[in-house]
């Protein structure tokens, strides 16, 4: 089964056509990446997949369900890490993951267990101070944990290692 299927996707901004009939299928249990120069439409495609941006034409299906602009029903299958993740700076990493878990309607015990696993995975398990004190690399690692929290079937990452130093890349 295809976890992601895109047919004849088109998008333009003003006079510039960014996507000109994109077609692709990504099977379950596979790895796929977009490679291209700035302005090639990589981030635009990701935002359309997430229902955050309206395409001019074409269809997107996630786990067999059609993605509709402005509706996030298919996002239950997706973990998303933007290029520069944003957080509530007054929270700790653990508090933030708890909030995200609640929005995903995860059980309290599952949230705590999964948060512990992921904070350990990304090397933030001992960080108890507010996110406002995190470096950009630490925020990127927290973004990775957030994207993985709900055990997504699809993980969409926009330049996921851009803020990680070599040690942070090994940790994540």
PLM segments and residue spans:
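Hydrophobic anchor residue at the start of the ABC signature
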Residues: 144
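Catalytic Walker B motif of ABC-type/P-loop ATPase nucleotide-binding domains
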Residues: 155-158
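Walker A (P-loop) phosphate-binding loop of ABC-type ATPase nucleotide-binding domains
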Residues: 37-41
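Conserved ABC ATPase "signature" region
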Residues: 98, 102, 109-126
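Conserved catalytic motifs of ABC-family nucleotide-binding domains
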Residues: 151
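Conserved ABC transporter NBD signature motif
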Residues: 58-69, 73-74
């Amino acid at each position: 089964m295809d976890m992601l299927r895109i047919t004849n996707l088109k998008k333009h901004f003003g006079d510039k056509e960014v996507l000109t009939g994109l077609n692709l299928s990504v099977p379950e249990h596979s790895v796929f990446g977009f490679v291209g120069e700035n302005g090639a439409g990589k981030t635009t495609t990701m935002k359309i997949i997430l229902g955050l941006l309206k395409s001019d034409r074409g269809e997107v299906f996630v786990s067999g369900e059609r993605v509709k602009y402005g509706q996030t029903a298919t996002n239950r299958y997706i973990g998303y890490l933007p290029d520069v993740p944003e957080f509530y700076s007054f929270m700790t990493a653990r508090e933030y993951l708890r909030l995200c878990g609640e929005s995903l309607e995860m059980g309290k015990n599952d949230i705590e267990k999964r948060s512990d696993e992921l904070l350990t995975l990304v090397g933030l398990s001992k960080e108890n101070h507010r996110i406002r004190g995190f470096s950009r690399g630490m925020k990127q690692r927290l973004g990775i944990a957030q994207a993985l929290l709900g055990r997504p079937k699809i993980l969409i990452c926009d330049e996921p290692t851009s803020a990680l130093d070599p040690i942070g890349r090994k940790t994540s």
